[in-house]
């Protein structure tokens, strides 16, 4: 039974877990396959692993990377790292060796916790290539979550090592964690060729997520289906803490597959849907859907056109919330209330969350536009304090009043409800994922047969936008097959253009 009624008082993630485990120790928190961890169970596992991290020398301010699919160990590692005052760097499981090498080096990673296999990827081989081809200095400590004969140490051995660490040592480490400390760093595509490291701090992560959960009217009885990758802000910042601050349970799907998603929602009686149209459409069109009981679904969040938002409603989430946000703003800045009429929820992201301010700006005059007029969306309040190791980008990203230049276009009505209108920047959103054309162009410009290349997005029924490349060749044009193979060697699959 849960006794959680009010907003948690904790201002750091470790303290939040302590608070919830004290209030509702027997309440389910993490469901991963056949395993269900209560808040009390989960806290105990986090603390034993946190002491293990202390035993191998992890300290406040260190940056520890996580590279794995959605599984309980991802969350245990996430909370254990923050418990000792270190910073989590969530790595994309689709990233190429080149991309991983950049992020591991840029963030100065000291330890990487990973699963040896993810779907069809051998991460032991991938990380070996990173070491051979790109070099890592200093070389991080590698901690596989599963047994690996080639590894001297595994993530699973941390509790045994931590048994030698006194509780007082962990208490001291946790006490030093501040509400303004960086909790995690997420990499997101930017308007240049290299991704941006976005640090997010403890208190805003908790406070913003609480407001997101309030707009959905979440309670401890809710169970959130999570197939969105935990390495996205939509997963490890938005969904996780919106649900956790309201005392509910997270039902993990290791990776998205529509048939399995339908089965999980039915079997686990999930009430909260978190997904994009690239997920809801294949779920709706799946042949198993008519035979699945999805009546437990109630609310959740999604993004997209009215037709795309309607897909979540058609799956059963009748109180779905349309949202607007970005990684730099802790996932969401605007969320429409689940109880608003559907016709409003289909088109509007609603008003800003508590702790957030918004302006719609004429980029030519830098003045506010009138209600109903379109301009650039600028945000203030719950935001990153700036990009990691990148003062030049920081100077460009924030205006003279400290508002974030989102590069997105929108309108505000008389009630302050935001409607998203498109992108000011050249960013392409394919399958719900932001991709920078400049990054792709920089890779393909190294192809021996390409003289010039321009990458853009074109309308796509399934992905919203699909990547397309316009190429000027130096001689005989390369085939589409050759271009796809070239791109897949250095880019994540979703960044490889589909049309040439």
Regions found by a protein language model. Name each.
Residues 9, 26-71, 75-79, 96-101, ...:
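Conserved AMP-binding/adenylate-forming core of the ANL superfamily
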Residues 10, 26, 144-147, 151-153, ...:
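Conserved pre-ATP/AMP-binding loop-to-beta segment of ANL
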Residues 38-40, 176, 183-207:
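Conserved AMP-binding A3 loop
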Residues 55-56, 84-159, 291, 473-476:
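Structural core segment of the AMP-binding/adenylate-forming
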Residues 95-105, 112-114, 378-381, 385-386, ...:
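AMP-binding/adenylate-forming catalytic core of the ANL superfamily
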Residues 160, 267-275, 284-345, 357:
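Gly/Ser/Thr-rich phosphate-binding loop
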Residues 206-226, 231-271, 282-286:
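Conserved AMP-binding/adenylation subdomain of ANL enzymes
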Residues 351-355, 367-397, 435:
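Conserved ATP/PPi-binding loop(s) of AMP-dependent carboxylate-activating enzymes
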